[in-house]
Amino acid sequence: MAVVNIREVYPGVSLGLWQMDEEVEQLFEQYPHLQAYKSSLEEKYKNDGRKLEFLAIRALMYEMLKANGASKGLLSHAGDIIHNEAGKPLFRGYHISVSHTKGYAALILSRNQEVAVDIEYFSDRVERISSKFLRKDENASDLDSKLVHWCAKETVYKLFSEENLKFDDMRVKPFDTMSDWACDVENLKNKKVAHVDFELTMEFVLTYAAM
């Protein structure tokens, strides 16, 4: 298995991280309940990378439910993640959010809070597109800060998925990537403020929130 960690990040909110370093067939062997998706995956995706993303999230869901003491009946349905018309993932009795990036998959879940997560691999490509997601009244002078702004806004977009927010509809309040490890993001449409925690590593930026 390739679970990096599963932890409670807020009361009643679990966050899981999976490193996708296995082959597709290994996941089918390790998690027999995923065999039910084999034919549909073959039809839908030609690329093994997309298949691996699909399976890794569902394997991670299984491990997180198991860690939370879920019944065998619920564990047998750990792959039953669907999406609504807005693209928001849904799972029976839980609020969930998922994200993938190069080599990693992340999942956050809660029974009673809206949750959101985003993960992006560490790259300077964000420099080239920063004008698309940064507002003029936001301060993001270095690469780390720009990555956090980007991921934090993606997280808040998911948190308010029904509102179909644009990047300019969100404003990240000033923060320090060296000491704060969290930032506040204002939804300018409804005036609500989301507290977004973030983690910076040599490989990725991870942001998550709950409301």
Residue map of PLM features:
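Core catalytic alpha/beta fold that binds nucleotide/phospho-ligands
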Residues: 1-211
